[in-house]
Every structure is written in C-alpha cells, then in structure tokens.
C-alpha cells in the first residue's frame, strides 16, 4: 500500500472512531509513522505497532527488527498521545525466534506487544499440526506470555488457556 492509501484509510478510521466516541486505539498495520501522523492530526490517542511478518525467514526477521528499532526511536517526534509498540502479526506469519525477540524488545522498551492469536479454528488446527500445541500453549512454551502481550481476537481459547493468559 502507498503512503497515501494508508493516510486516507487511517484518516477515515480516526473519523469513525471520533464519531463513535472512541478516544484511544491500538493499531497494527503497514506504515506506522503515517498512522501516527494522522493520529496527531485528528487529536486521538493511539498505540501504533510496527508490524512484523518474517514468514519464517531469517533475513526478513532481521529487516523487521531493524524497522522496529528505528520506529521506537521516533516516539519523541510525537506528542504523548502517540506511542509505538511492536506487532508480530501472528504465529502463522512470524517465527518463534522473532516472537521471542519481540518479547525481549517489548520488555526492554517497556512497550506492549500486539499479536493476532486464535482467530480461527483453522489457525488452531494448523498450530497443532505445526507445533504440536494450541496457539496459547505454543506462546507459553516460547516463554512470551506476559502482561505486555495484547491479543487481538482470541476467539478459540479454552478455559485453561484463559487462566494461562491471566497469570
């Protein structure tokens, strides 16, 4: 997507949020600086994640790391209403190594982690096939469950996994 595509999409999203009474949001998308600029323009508060997709490729993981290291330094260019976080997309697009790095990065910079998890039955089945574990149990095994982790969706999570997340 172009910078202009993201700009107008973010502008529309902010306008809809304002119309509905939303004052603060947490977003993970391409071109996070553009979303941050729009957030400033529109007067909202936002936590904006630098999205990561490594596709289980080490070179892509390194690009993601560098991108997020630069992004987190940009926070001082914005008012206190705009904060950055890290957004490893999902367990089916991001390697375990990058998830562990994102966890360490978030702890070091005291920022949240935005992660899509347990969105579909297919994701749970694929996780069981690939890792031998459900998505939440896979994250537990990696050691990346923490209060910094914000899960988007979380539809297919059982009661034991809810307790794991709460702990």
Task: Name each model-derived stretch.
Residues 157-160, 166-167:
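A conserved active-site cap/scaffold subdomain adjacent to cofactor or substrate pockets
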Residues 1-43, 66-78:
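Alpha-helical scaffold segments that flank or form the walls of functional sites
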Residues 36-155:
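Metal-coordinating catalytic core of metallo-dependent amide/deamination hydrolases
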Residues 105, 164-165:
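Catalytic-core regions built around general acid/base machinery
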Residues 34, 160-161:
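Short acidic active-site motifs
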